[in-house]
Amino acid sequence: MNKELSFEEGIEHLERIVRELEQKEVPLEQALNLFRQGIELVQKCNNQLDYAEKQMQILLENPNGELEVRPADFPVEG
């Protein structure tokens, strides 16, 4: 995977891999290679989601009843 894939491209590629693996005539070596690629894509997409979560902001009401924007405060693994 030389090219940086967007999240959506990664999911599409992962779906293609799953469809190909579901075919019964896939040789073992090819299936293992596809499985490895799929695992790499899942990790990449998870990292992209984690990054997006870090960038999100949550609109909250402060004690004065005013709305304020604060960074989301939830744990992100990575």
UniProtKB/Swiss-Prot annotation:
Its EC number is 3.1.11.6. The gene is xseB. The lineage of its organism: Bacteria, Bacillati, Bacillota, Clostridia, Eubacteriales. It catalyses: Exonucleolytic cleavage in either 5'- to 3'- or 3'- to 5'-direction to yield nucleoside 5'-phosphates. Heterooligomer composed of large and small subunits. Bidirectionally degrades single-stranded DNA into large acid-insoluble oligonucleotides, which are then degraded further into small acid-soluble oligonucleotides. Pfam families: Exonuc_VII_S (PF02609). It is found in: Cytoplasm. Belongs to the XseB family. SUPFAM superfamilies: XseB-like. This is Exodeoxyribonuclease 7 small subunit. HAMAP family: Exonuc_7_S. GO terms for cellular component: cytosol; exodeoxyribonuclease VII complex. GO terms for biological process: DNA catabolic process. It comes from the Bacteria. One of its GO terms (molecular function) is exodeoxyribonuclease VII activity. Keywords: Cytoplasm, Exonuclease, Hydrolase, Nuclease. It comes from Desulfitobacterium hafniense (strain Y51).
